[in-house]
A protein has these predicted regions:
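Structural signature of PLP-dependent enzymes
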Residues: 162-187
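Active-site core of PLP-dependent enzymes with the aminotransferase class I/II
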Residues: 41-47, 63-84
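Active-site PLP attachment segment
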Residues: 1, 108-140, 151-158
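A short glycine-threonine-serine/GTX helix/turn-capping micro-motif
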Residues: 46, 142-152
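PLP-dependent enzyme catalytic core of the Aspartate aminotransferase-like
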Residues: 167-169, 177, 228-289
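Conserved PLP phosphate-binding loop immediately N-terminal to the Schiff-base lysine helix
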Residues: 58-73, 86-108, 114
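PLP-dependent aspartate aminotransferase-fold enzymes
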Residues: 1-55
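Conserved PLP-binding catalytic core of the aspartate aminotransferase-like
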Residues: 179-183, 187-223, 273-288
Length: 289
């Protein structure tokens, strides 16, 4: 359903979340069935969402990714959904469990009609969960839903154990603390190397970009040199409970060293020559306003 937005124009999603997507294999009958809108943008809310909501069955958004949204914006979105009898759905697959033992909408204080969870909810095991208001969820009983895994217990068991442990250890608070440390490492390493840096994301879901001539090459070099130190890293970091102080310290030393190398190579126009393979592919990008 998401890709169907690009049936009308291949550029429909370029300023949304995932630019560079081809709607291959998507039935043409879904053309005009999805209308993208800009997240946390009040102008677009007035111009498009309010006008088109009456034609829609649901409004689906991620409540947060790169940064926390305006609470006022989410409240207005909820108001529009209610006025037009739309179901407001929050995709919490990425944002949940990062800052507290629940979806991030609980921290923001705006509650959707339906929320979707996955991945982290079972700490990596295959598990998903959909929660919502009774009058909406009951409609699922009128549809055909089948599965070969009705009696599978691993996913639910892992999810219950994860949620219990998450709450017991206050993991959200820990992830925020670790994420702040990582962001600070990037900032200080860039300052030390004389590089300009852009850091984005909420603390547990952070990313960085060194503002050099060719960041695609720079990011590839960073990954390459980190691998040599037996560190699997990229230009983003999803904070983890098992990121111990000693591991973070090892990562810090590596960042200082590699950022300095990038600065030197960039200065001497030798960064691309220092790659031991092709630069990372960036055709399938992820951008969030």
């Amino acid at each position: 359903w998401y890709l169907s937005a690009n049936l009308k124009s291949k550029l429909s999603l370029n300023n949304h979340l995932l630019p560079g997507l081809e709607p291959l294999g998507v039935p043409k009958g879904l053309r005009n069935s999805v209308l993208p809108f800009k997240f946390n943008d009040f102008y677009d809310l007035e111009k498009n969402v309010k006008k088109k909501a009456k034609y829609c069955a649901a409004i689906v958004i991620e409540p947060c990714r790169e940064k926390l949204p305006s609470k006022k914006y989410l409240k207005e979105l909820k108001k529009i959904a209610k006025q037009n009898n739309c179901v407001l759905i929050f995709d919490e697959i990425t944002s949940a469990w990062r800052t507290s033992t629940s979806g991030i909408h609980m921290d923001i204080g705006v509650y959707p009609d339906v929320a979707v969870f996955g991945k982290t909810i079972a700490n990596g095991f295959a598990m998903g969960a959909i929660i919502g208001k009774k009058k909406i969820m009951q409609n699922a009983t009128k549809t055909f839903i089948s599965s070969a895994f009705w009696t599978e217990r691993m996913g639910p068991s892992c999810a219950l154990a994860f949620i219990k442990k998450h709450k017991q250890l206050n993991i959200g608070k820990i992830l925020i603390k670790k994420g702040k440390k990582i962001k600070n490492i990037w900032y200080k390493a860039a300052q030390n190397a004389g590089l300009d840096i852009t850091i984005q994301g909420i603390d547990p879901l952070a990313s960085f970009k060194l503002n050099i001539k060719d960041w695609r090459t720079g990011a590839t070099y960073f990954i390459q040199e980190m691998l040599k130190k037996r560190i699997l890293a990229s230009d983003r970091c999803y904070a983890n409970y098992m990121h111990t102080d000693s591991l973070i310290r090892k990562y810090e030393l590596a960042c200082f060293e590699i950022f300095k190398k990038i600065a030197e190579l960039e200065k001497n126009n030798k960064l691309s020559q220092s790659l031991e393979g092709p630069p990372k592919q960036m055709d399938f990008g992820r951008l969030t306003n």
